[in-house]
Amino acid sequence: MESQQLHQNPHSLHGSAYASVTSKEVPSNQDPLAVSASNLPEFDRDSTKVNSQQETTPGTSAVPENHHHVSPQPASVPPPQNGQYQQHGMMTPNKAMASNWAHYQQPSMMTCSHYQTSPAYYQPDPHYPLPQYIPPLSTSSPDPIDLKNQHSEIPQAKTKVGNNVLPPHTLTSEENFSTWVKFYIRFLKNSNLGDIIPNDQGEIKRQMTYEEHAYIYNTFQAFAPFHLLPTWVKQILEINYADILTVLCKSVSKMQTNNQELKDWIALANLEYDGSTSADTFEITVSTIIQRLKENNINVSDRLACQLILKGLSGDFKYLRNQYRTKTNMKLSQLFAEIQLIYDENKIMNLNKPSQYKQHSEYKNVSRTSPNTTNTKVTTRNYHRTNSSKPRAAKAHNIATSSKFSRVNNDHINESTVSSQYLSDDNELSLGQQQKESKPTHTIDSNDELPDHLLIDSGASQTLVRSAHYLHHATPNSEINIVDAQKQDIPINAIGNLHFNFQNGTKTSIKALHTPNIAYDLLSLSELANQNITACFTRNTLERSDGTVLAPIVKHGDFYWLSKKYLIPSHISKLTINNVNKSKSVNKYPYPLIHRMLGHANFRSIQKSLKKNAVTYLKESDIEWSNASTYQCPDCLIGKSTKHRHVKGSRLKYQESYEPFQYLHTDIFGPVHHLPKSAPSYFISFTDEKTRFQWVYPLHDRREESILNVFTSILAFIKNQFNARVLVIQMDRGSEYTNKTLHKFFTNRGITACYTTTADSRAHGVAERLNRTLLNDCRTLLHCSGLPNHLWFSAVEFSTIIRNSLVSPKNDKSARQHAGLAGLDITTILPFGQPVIVNNHNPDSKIHPRGIPGYALHPSRNSYGYIIYLPSLKKTVDTTNYVILQDNQSKLDQFNYDTLTFDDDLNRLTAHNQSFIEQNETEQSYDQNTESDHDYQSEIEINSDPLVNDFSSQSMNPLQLDHEPVQKVRAPKEVDADISEYNILPSPVRSRTPHIINKESTEMGGTIESDTTSPRHSSTFTARNQKRPGSPNDMIDLTSQDRVNYGLENIKTTRLGGTEEPYIQRNSDTNIKYRTTNSTPSIDDRSSNSESTTPIISIETKAVCDNTPSIDTDPPEYRSSDHATPNIMPDKSSKNVTADSILDDLPLPDLTHKSPTDTSDVSKDIPHIHSRQTNSSLGGMDDSNVLTTTKSKKRSLEDNETEIEVSRDTWNNKNMRSLEPPRSKKRINLIAAIKGVKSIKPVRTTLRYDEAITYNKDNKEKDRYVEAYHKEISQLLKMNTWDTNKYYDRNDIDPKKVINSMFIFNKKRDGTHKARFVARGDIQHPDTYDSDMQSNTVHHYALMTSLSIALDNDYYITQLDISSAYLYADIKEELYIRPPPHLGLNDKLLRLRKSLYGLKQSGANWYETIKSYLINCCDMQEVRGWSCVFKNSQVTICLFVDDMILFSKDLNANKKIITTLKKQYDTKIINLGERDNEIQYDILGLEIKYQRSKYMKLGMEKSLTEKLPKLNVPLNPKGKKLRAPGQPGHYIDQDELEIDEDEYKEKVHEMQKLIGLASYVGYKFRFDLLYYINTLAQHILFPSRQVLDMTYELIQFMWDTRDKQLIWHKNKPTKPDNKLVAISDASYGNQPYYKSQIGNIFLLNGKVIGGKSTKASLTCTSTTEAEIHAVSEAIPLLNNLSHLVQELNKKPIIKGLLTDSRSTISIIKSTNEEKFRNRFFGTKAMRLRDEVSGNNLYVYYIETKKNIADVMTKPLPIKTFKLLTNKWIH
């Protein structure tokens, strides 16, 4: 493109600008970039040489090679005029593209108007608008080619030649940007732009104009091509393409940071200390330097630091050099303590000894002023404009300036003076040091002083005058002290102002101090700068910032002076000034010093202590007490800060102007724990500020949507009912109020959200007090009425109604009256919990009662009715049809409604009793409606209470019962919240079994038994319901004629499975009949189906048919426990497989068999019933919960339930029993913490770098870790883990791709020390790995299966290890890591090439790598469905990361695989396994002893012996050993845990550590502990004392049995098949919320290879359902193991499943496809049928006493636990 022409502006002048640049130089601070070439790094010096300017003489010149520069012009060409650039300074487009700045899609050059600079910046060539060096006129431009060779000979670049300015060289590479920017900043400073360049703090002295901005942008663009800029610069410019100043600011900051390390070393090497400053300050300074070096990975040892400090000690501290000279182990803390001791001794010695005032010749250039009241240091500053290049004005030697602004030599950075400044405290005086007036002395010849003039000092912070003649408004000094370099005070007599009257009538005033103790009067440029007055030393004038000359200044000697003629004299009396009470501060210590010395004690405490002589060597009169009472210590304000007390009534002034319902207070209460899901857990309250009217709304959660719905309702209610608009809502700062949703809601409606201030909860007192009042009322009402806790919100609702109607003590009206509502009609209110009878207008039958007992709660909000709670229906209804029971002595008191037992006929009669509610009686909706607070009470299910004995309190035998038992008043009970709505009906039969404790004790402390039998309904069922055949709601018809005969007869009853059992003939006088159950569960064995029988007392009844379809249409006769019930299999091979063949060789206990009909001792077979209601326990829920489970239409009686039939004529007397207030009972609820347990958090067993090496005090261990560290580094380099040929700048890489790295150290079990360099994959960005890739390892079941097959087939077992396995896998992604710490490259990054340990993708990469190698090079195939299990015709391999286990019949086959692996990987043989005697292995934590052809023992004795003592558990190694891990009957208390937060975290961490180790051991081989581990793991977040004690007991048992082993013996060679068996068991409802515990044990050829204990995911409603759930969990794993066994061993396989539930077996083999009880149960049952029939699975019955899976589902007595486990683990 055609080049642009430069227009000359004939009207613009440049003379003034030229004069300013050439003759006026700014006295500026030291340039942080002005570092000599000798101090530059190598690449800086190289770049300096390349871009240097050859020195010139008047006859020669040189111009650097630069395509932007043009040849210099002949001397005849005059300097160009300052005209505008063509097109306002626009660069030609081709030049812009050459610099690649078109990237910003902005104009290449900024348009700018005329910017005046020196004519030396303009060149005659009109084609180039940027400055270039102008050589002398007599020379010509050298050849650029020749210049290229001359650059290397130039030692350092020149910035100026004569009056010409050299532009910066062009940026040549990204790495040289830091060097280039130094020259560019210097170029701008020489271009009169130094005062707009930011310093290292980002500060500028003035704002630049647009022309200057354009000039900076254009020059930067011209000399810095865009493609050569660093990434961080590009990022700044991409945001704002013209923001060059930000780039310069960050550049300066980076250079300062890089130089900090050098400065710290210099400061440390030049430390000096003579006691002139406090020892504490000196220690802080040195420690700060050392800490800063440490942060830069430079560790300064104590020995080196002590040597540097000792070198700088002088005075009384010098002798410490000799003391520490011979010491080898010097501690820095000890040295500081010695220095502090000497410093304190010197203070005491100088207590009454005045120090000599030093001569002025000893003064250094340090001057500060410190007001006593604020203890604030005032250091001198230089505020005048930096627009001159000549040296600044000289400084007075007796008042020196801060060395921060002194010029430092470029070749040497001396920090000693800087360090000495910061080591001192300006206000600090040694004890005994006196301030006295010194005589004026002169450090210069008196002839140098210019009479009647003020010395202009650029370093003084204050103006000082010796005469008070010019001091205006003088006041005696009592605050300011002037301290010299030796910390000696210069007394100040007075403080005042100097008034100046300059030329042109300009007047100004500055602050001045009067003292006669100085050599001459000092005028501070800092004070002048505050008045916008600067000194121009080139023109020798004082000027305003706009250039107005105020007065000339005179140079005399080395100093500049201002005449005193410009001062306006004062008429103050000299006597007033000179008679200042100097004794006021002389010999007195400043109060701030004493305050600090006495530990920042209170003013009154210090003063009183001195009066009482509690502090010696110091008197009260020795301290300056002026302003002491008002002194504010900054450290005290920070350290002793307290919050202000709430100002009572502070909010009232903001609320007086509001009308009723315009200002609301709101707050949320909750949660309330242990409630049914249908009951609310929170409530939100509202209070009107003006009327104090209150509203409450129930909440189930605190979600944004729920809160928003309530606010919408309350605002609409107030608007419609009171015709008012809410303007302000006051609330706290909870997240439910501060969320964006609610904030937007308020904004859209113009409502002001008023939040409480931080830590001022009392400002929210209206809402807080309301909640407290409502809760107090709620607790009182519930306690008084005895209603269950789930009705708590009804109590709150009732309280709100009453509180709105009553007059508070502070008001003269009630809230209703203030709101304009009528008063409360007392006739519409009933006492909370008042017993009532609700009329039933539509019963199912005419003989059904017309009244239902209930309890009045509160008036209805939606009708004129009342909210009534009906315990029998577990519902609340809104009705007016009720009758109040007023006579407490009515005949109803003799009945107990809750303990009634209904027969099946009456159960059918009440089947539809919900339909009795007429139109005026609204059944409560299931949905939560904020307009109807009582709605939440719908479908409240109640939990059953423990039974109360209705019989005589005296001991009775089962056959002697009272005819008219004394019955107790019972309240409504609570049932499981998960039971369907049909279960809320009264149960047809209630269990009424007395409890007798058997005095015979067991090993666990006794067995609790009932003294009555557990009768079942006989097989005589009614046919009354024939009109609905097949209905599951069939009931037993018992009429009033079904009387009990006194005669006895033998009859038979049909069991659930079809087994007929005889009734045992007994004499009895009772009218109650008993029947036989098919199980007699122990207190913790409810899931078992024991074969013991119960005697039956026969009753003469009417036999009728049963229409209920039987599960087993043709059940077998009862067999003894030795026989099993086989499953009918479709496979022909079932003929050869019998129960005996399945049970053979299994490690089952040996039992003494009893006849199933033996009834010699009836009482021993009575089911055990616990008399105490309990919560969730380690052993599960108490049997009483099962026994009281109600029978409903959808829930049949379970096998282990005991029931008593009651004659029909007693029903009408007992059905009204529950009219007395019910008792509140504790529900069986799981603690909220159990729900939060997701998994066991692994405990860190490794050490960090600082723990293993830096701070490791064990030198031997440290040396081993150091050796391991270097070994790991060598391995990483050997594997080419990263690029070693290039380091990347940290700022140039996308942070997402940067992975943090660290070293971890650990000690292996064999004693070796291991170091591992790992990546922090836990904080790896998701974009840097493929989340679909999986890291696979061998399943533990697969390993156990392989070991079992190896034992049975005499396989050789070889153990291998591949060193640094992950590093063999390449990494595909672009990732960077920080280098190891020994390299010291903190700001550099390394490009990863290998899969470093810790990365998310490393495991998957290694798996794919080794899998490919094994398949392609070793001819292996991976077993389908079992990853990391590989096999060929001879060898099986189990792979666990870098560990390999090889199994083969031929050892040479293993060796062949090893040879192939060594070709590619560094493979170590841990154990070849070639010996024939016993071989010991350590495989994946298991300690294995293997004797081929004989046995295999698996244990962890060594590991547990080492790890368990380190858990901080109080082990009892010498005491009596525990014989079981837990005891049945121990229940975990569910009361809320109140604990400190720190203690809670500590205990949770302890639980994680203990359960983590126990879980590891349990799933490895201690399957007998899995139940206890699983139960305690659910309580990790509930670390109560009881839970911890149970955990300690488990750990103690592990310690006592640490030598136990899982014992395997070789299978008999006569066995042609592999036999795989799963034994299943379930414990019904023994977990929180009626969950069941299920367990399975898997055996291969009689060897236990795995076990599992877990809580059922679904809530089972019967024992059979729980057993089916357990079986359904076992079958899939059983099938997968079957496939694995067939792949590893080609023998035929027999699969068996054993369970102790006959009903489960019947359902599995049944072909009946009628509808099941619920879809979950039915789905599982149908699936089991398909899996059993389709997988040749044999299902057999196993006696409960032989079921070894029983240990997986419940705690057992010691005897039973041993019996079930001693065959397979001992």
Curated annotation (Swiss-Prot):
The record marks 397-398, 578-579, 1232-1233 as: Cleavage. Keywords: Aspartyl protease, ATP-binding, Cytoplasm, DNA integration, DNA recombination, DNA-binding, DNA-directed DNA polymerase, Endonuclease, Hydrolase, Magnesium, Metal-binding, Multifunctional enzyme, Nuclease, Nucleotide-binding, Nucleotidyltransferase, Nucleus, Protease, RNA-binding, RNA-directed DNA polymerase, Transferase, Transposable element, Transposition, Viral release from host cell, Virion maturation, Zinc, Zinc-finger. Mg(2+) 3 binds at residues 1625, 1667, 1700. Disulfide bonds: none annotated. Residues 1353-1491 form the Reverse transcriptase Ty1/copia-type domain. InterPro entries: DNA/RNA_pol_sf, Integrase_cat-core, PolX-like_BBD, Retrotran_Ty1/copia-like, RNaseH-like_sf, RNaseH_sf, RVT_2, TYA. Residues 295-397 are annotated as: RNA-binding. Residues 579-636 are annotated as: Integrase-type zinc finger-like. A motif (Bipartite nuclear localization signal) lies at residues 1193-1227. Residues 1-11, 19-39, 49-60, 399-408, 415-435, 1009-1024, 1065-1082 have a biased composition (Polar residues). It comes from the Eukaryota. The keyword Transcription does not apply. It comes from Saccharomyces cerevisiae (strain ATCC 204508 / S288c). Residues 656-831 form the Integrase catalytic domain. Residues 1-86, 359-453, 1005-1038, 1058-1135, 1146-1165, 1170-1205 are annotated as: Disordered. Pfam families: Pol_BBD (PF22936), rve (PF00665), RVT_2 (PF07727), TYA (PF01021). This is Transposon Ty2-LR1 Gag-Pol polyprotein. The keyword Transferase applies. CDD domains: RNase_HI_RT_Ty1. Mg(2+) 2 binds at residues 1361, 1442-1443. The lineage of its organism: Eukaryota, Fungi, Dikarya, Ascomycota, Saccharomycotina. Residues 1625-1767 form the RNase H Ty1/copia-type domain. Residues 369-381 have a biased composition (Low complexity).
